[in-house]
Amino acid sequence: MRKILPSKLAFGIFDHLDEDGNAMARQYADRLTLAEACDRLGFYAYHLAEHHFSPHGRSPSPNLFLSSVAQRTRQLRLGPLVMLLSLSHPLRAFEEICMLDHLSGGRAELGIGRGSLPIELGYFGIDPDAVAGRYFEASEILMEAMRGGNLSYRGDHFELNNVPLILRPHQRPHPPTWIATNRPESARWAATNGANVACVGPASLVRRITDAFRSEEGLSSDANCNASFLGLLRMIVVGHSAEHAYSLAAPAFQRWLNNFKFLYDLHAIPVPPNLPLTFDAAIESELCVVGTAAVVRRTLLDQLEEAGANYLLCQVAFGDLPLDASLYTAMTIQSELMDRVG
């Protein structure tokens, strides 16, 4: 595990693996090609979301896909962002993370969360009222399991009796942990517990999260030995000209938006109020950063500074963006940002 705070900006890849219109096998192959390229380019990690029964995510089992990424890369770290602990049995989650950590030679990053859309969990018979409790208990069990030995636990949702924990993670005491949040109180919890945070939203609002994290981190006596990444997520498209970039990004964002809204529309429920419903709104809300290399570099650096973030989560593949476009954006981020300021 990391032992010092990051002194410079770091850069990773975030992916929903949302449906791009191609056959699943083709899309998986394209993403593996992208992951290989990002490994060569020096990105820190590849983070993959978990979604179910929706075109918003073709990776309902992130660890399964990430095991393929692990075999095709050498330095790139990898992990779910987030693994839905409200859905998974914590012992199963523990065993999967141990396997991924060893398959990757100790490169796993562990993002955990409860899930943002109750409908997805409802398909599995999870009562929305039970989600928070299941997540709390599962996260307790998961982190306790990392210690090894025999595990017993009694809660409202899980009961374990002297379970022999044969597996151990490669990284000790456990892989670096992450949460995704837009709430200052969650950021304070992360700082106290040595977790990293990933945020999405306007830089001015994300600043509240990073300030809360740092204020709590300064009070913590035992969490500061591990590096803290304060991540800012952006959907990024770089083109040879502004017109070229916008011609790629606008239709890709629309497809991504349709994928995102699929279950909301199917069940006639309102989408999150902060979701931009047009490409122009996505630019205005800072979710998307699109343009030439110079414009994108300047915009991202300004937003990172305003947000107080030290880790840029680059979503360079979304909707029906062609693989070549994603590769070009990744290469430009490497040359224009990572080489200069990373």
Curated annotation (Swiss-Prot):
Disulfide bonds: none annotated. The keyword Zinc does not apply. It comes from the Bacteria. GO terms for molecular function: monooxygenase activity; oxidoreductase activity, acting on paired donors, with incorporation or reduction of molecular oxygen. SUPFAM superfamilies: Bacterial luciferase-like. Gene3D superfamilies: Luciferase-like domain (3.20.20.30). The keyword Oxidoreductase applies. One of its GO terms (cellular component) is cytosol. Pfam families: Bac_luciferase. Transmembrane segments: none annotated. InterPro entries: Bact_Lucif_Oxidored (IPR050766), Luciferase-like_dom (IPR011251), Luciferase-like_sf (IPR036661). Keywords: Monooxygenase, Oxidoreductase, Plasmid. Belongs to the bacterial luciferase oxidoreductase family. PANTHER family: BLR5498 PROTEIN, LUCIFERASE-LIKE MONOOXYGENASE. This is Uncharacterized protein y4wF.
